[in-house]
C-alpha cells in the first residue's frame, strides 16, 4: 500500500476535533512521543542562588524593529532552519540557548543586541 499524503491530509481536514484528539493520543502511544510544547526550565532553587553562576540561559525578550537581522543571528547561533528561527523570534520571549558558559552567553547576547534584539541572561 503506497502512502498518499494528499489523501491523509484530506481525511484530517474532514475529521472532527474529537477525532483529531484521539488521533494525536494514538500517535503518542504508538511512537512513544508527546505533542506537548517544551516547557521552560524552572529557576534555580534558593541554595544555588547565592553561588556564582557558571552557566546561563539566553532569553530573547523582544526582536525589536529589525526582525530579519535577528532571525539571521538566531539561525547562526542555534543552527535552526529559517522557519524554526522565525517562529522562535516571533514567539519572544523565548529561550535561544540553555546552559551556556558565561563567556558564550555574553557573546550571544552581544550578537543579538547588535542585530536589534532585547536579550536577558538567566
Curated annotation (Swiss-Prot):
One term of GO molecular function: mRNA binding
Keywords: Ribonucleoprotein, Ribosomal protein
Keyword Membrane: no
Gene Ontology biological process terms, A to Z: translation
Signal peptide start-end: none
Entry-linked Pfam families: Ribosomal_L12, Ribosomal_L12_N
Gene Ontology, cellular component aspect: cytosolic large ribosomal subunit
SUPFAM superfamilies in the cross-refs: ClpS-like, Ribosomal protein L7/12, oligomerisation (N-terminal) domain
Source taxon at top rank: Bacteria
InterPro entries linked to this entry: Ribosomal_bL12 (IPR000206), Ribosomal_bL12_C (IPR013823), Ribosomal_bL12_C/ClpS-like (IPR014719), Ribosomal_bL12_oligo (IPR008932), Ribosomal_bL12_oligo_N_sf (IPR036235)
Keyword Ribosomal protein: yes
NCBIfam families in UniProt: L12 (TIGR00855)
Protein's job: Forms part of the ribosomal stalk which helps the ribosome interact with GTP-bound translation factors. Is thus essential for accurate translation.
Assigned protein family: Belongs to the bacterial ribosomal protein bL12 family.
Complex and partners: Homodimer. Part of the ribosomal stalk of the 50S ribosomal subunit. Forms a multimeric L10(L12)X complex, where L10 forms an elongated spine to which 2 to 4 L12 dimers bind in a sequential fashion. Binds GTP-bound translation factors.
PANTHER family in the cross-refs: 39S RIBOSOMAL PROTEIN L12, LARGE RIBOSOMAL SUBUNIT PROTEIN BL12M
Protein name (database record): Large ribosomal subunit protein bL12
Amino acid at each position: 500500500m503506497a502512502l498518499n499524503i494528499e489523501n491523509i491530509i484530506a481525511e484530517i481536514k474532514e475529521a472532527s476535533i474529537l477525532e483529531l484528539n484521539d488521533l494525536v493520543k494514538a500517535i503518542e502511544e504508538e511512537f512513544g512521543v508527546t505533542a506537548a510544547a517544551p516547557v521552560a526550565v524552572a529557576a534555580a532553587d534558593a541554595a544555588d542562588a547565592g553561588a556564582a553562576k557558571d552557566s546561563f540561559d539566553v532569553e530573547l525578550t523582544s526582536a525589536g524593529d529589525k526582525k530579519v537581522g535577528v532571525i539571521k543571528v538566531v539561525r547562526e547561533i542555534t543552527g535552526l532552519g529559517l522557519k524554526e528561527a522565525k517562529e522562535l523570534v516571533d514567539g519572544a520571549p523565548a529561550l535561544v540557548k540553555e546552559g551556556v558558559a558565561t563567556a558564550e552567553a555574553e557573546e550571544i547576547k552581544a550578537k543579538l543586541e547588535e542585530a536589534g534584539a532585547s536579550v536577558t541572561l538567566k
